[in-house]
Every structure is written in C-alpha cells, then in structure tokens.
C-alpha cells in the first residue's frame, strides 16, 4: 500500500476520515486489496493506488418527487484514461483555458488562505488534477483527497500527481461521499453544480459537501443573474439555445443556512465573460 511523503500509510492517514458510501459505517482498520465496512460488510476494491468508492444513485433513491433522468450521462463520462487525457489536454492547449485556470488558482488560494490552516481537504470532483496545485499551494501541509466519479480522471490525476505533496486518490460520487460527518477540514467542489439539472441533485450535493466538511466549503455555481446568462436568456427566442443550468445566490444562501453553513463570499470568475462564481461557505458554530 502507498505511503505519503511523511511515511504514513494510507490506512493510518484515512482511518478517521473515510466511511462506507453505502451505509456510512467505518471501515475495518486493515486493508490492502479491498475495503470492508464494519457494520454491513460492504466491499470496495483497491487497485493501483486508487480506492474504488463510487456508488451510483439518483434522486429516485433519495425519496424525492423529482424525476431522476438527470446527471447520469455526465457521471459516465471520463471513465477511460484516454478520454480523461483528451479533456485535460484541451485545458493545457488552449490559451483561454489556461487563463481561466490561472484565475481559478487565485480564487481558490484566496479562499483557503482566508481560513485557519487545514490538515485534510477533499477535492471533489478532482478531474485530472487541474486545480490540485492551487489547493496544495494554499495548504502545503494538508492531505488532499482527490476524488472523482470518473475512474479515468482519477487515474490521470494520479499519473500527474504533485511531487512532494500529500495526495490520496479515490473514485467517489458527490451524492454519496465516502467520508465521515465532519471528516475533513474543507471541501473544494469546482465545476460540478452546473452539470446537475435538477434542484434535487443540487440540494443533495450541497448537503453532502456541508456534511463532510468540518470548517468550510469552496464551490462553484453558474449564476442565474450573471451578465453572461442574462444575455443568453435575452437571445434565446432568436437563437433557440437551451437554457444554462444555473443557481440563484439567494437559493444557495438560504439552503446552505438550513444545512448549517454561512455564505461568506462568492467572487465572479470573470464578471463579464463567465457566469461562474466561487462561493465560500463557512460552517456555523
């Protein structure tokens, strides 16, 4: 089993962090090729340094009235390493994407550095590790849990890991995060909410992020009232483009408050040219 740069085994580093995504119980303390949950004997494989903890579900499983034909197709993307490689190469190749990444780095670093130092940070979805460097720069001593529903993305992130940094890798669903309540100091969740078409999915993800975070959550959303989305809505009757998947800041503020978190700030990625905002939610109490 892998060790982090400080010589601590995966089992030791994650003993008080992980929980079974199927039932929430802790895992048995010793594992090498699989994880076994203590209460219900659910088994999850460990292969090539990656913990396979993703479980599939939809809003039908959460006993809500909303239909469940939602983000399933998106969740199936990037299961293969080759697909993930093409996606990440696009961000490295295009000048506009590189500029966006630089701005995202600044926003992530600003949010993390504004909070007390972290020991554990969950990066979900980590993708191919595009934004992992920003987290590591802002929290150099933290153990970063790199998680994504796409196995190919996690494989790519592991192959392109950050030398000398403490990283662990796993597949995971944002709807069933395999982490104990308040199991990590913080969660970074970038570029996911705008892929979830229904309120049920958005609320489920938000509740999971706040559940597992002890101190704060950084998350992005596409603002319904942004300049970019306003122009899109104005043009829609003429160009017939479908509406963006958006979120209203008041909904985020009120929903987060009901889950025990305060919306502290939400700077724009680019005020005129992007609808994305980087929200910082701080846990109450």
Label each residue range with its predicted role:
Residues 122, 128-176:
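Class I SAM-dependent methyltransferase SAM/SAH-binding core
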Residues 188:
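A conserved beta-strand element that flanks and buttresses the S-adenosyl-L-methionine
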Residues 2-73:
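N-terminal auxiliary segments of SAM/dcSAM-dependent transferases
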Residues 222-242:
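Short, glycine-/aromatic-enriched active-site segment of Class I SAM-dependent methyltransferases
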Residues 48, 54-115:
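Conserved class I S-adenosyl-L-methionine
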Residues 203-215:
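A short glycine-rich, Lys/Arg-flanked "PGG" loop and its adjoining helix->strand segment in the class I
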Residues 214-222:
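Conserved beta-strand signature within the Rossmann-like core of class I S-adenosyl-L-methionine
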Residues 243-260:
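Short alpha-helix
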């Amino acid at each position: 089993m892998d060790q982090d740069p400080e010589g601590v085994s995966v089992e030791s580093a994650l003993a008080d962090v992980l929980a079974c995504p199927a039932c929430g119980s802790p895992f048995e303390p010793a594992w090498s090729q699989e994880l076994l949950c203590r209460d219900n004997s659910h088994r999850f494989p460990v292969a090539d340094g990656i913990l396979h903890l993703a479980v599939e579900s939809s809003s039908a499983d959460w006993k809500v009235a909303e239909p469940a034909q939602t983000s399933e197709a998106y969740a199936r993307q990037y299961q293969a390493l080759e697909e993930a490689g093409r996606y990440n190469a696009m961000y490295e190749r295009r000048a506009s994407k590189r500029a966006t990444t630089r701005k995202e780095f600044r926003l992530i670093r600003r949010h993390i550095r504004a909070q007390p130092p972290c020991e554990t940070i969950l990066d979900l979805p980590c993708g191919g590790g595009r934004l992992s460097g920003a987290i590591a720069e802002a929290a150099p001593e933290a153990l970063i849990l790199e998680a994504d529903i796409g196995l190919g993305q996690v494989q790519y992130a592991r192959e392109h890991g950050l030398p000398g940094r403490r990283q662990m890798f796993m597949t995971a669903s944002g709807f069933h995060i395999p982490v104990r309540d308040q199991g990590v100091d913080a969660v970074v969740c970038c570029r996911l909410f705008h892929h979830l078409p229904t309120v049920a999915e958005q609320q489920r993800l938000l509740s999971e992020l706040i559940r597992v975070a002890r101190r704060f959550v950084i998350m992005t959303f596409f603002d319904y009232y942004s300049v970019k989305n306003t122009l899109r809505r104005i043009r829609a009757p003429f160009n017939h483009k479908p509406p963006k998947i958006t979120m209203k800041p008041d909904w985020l503020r009120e929903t987060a408050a009901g889950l025990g978190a305060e919306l502290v700030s939400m700077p724009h990625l680019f005020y005129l040219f992007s609808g994305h905002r980087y929200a910082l939610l701080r846990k109450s109490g």
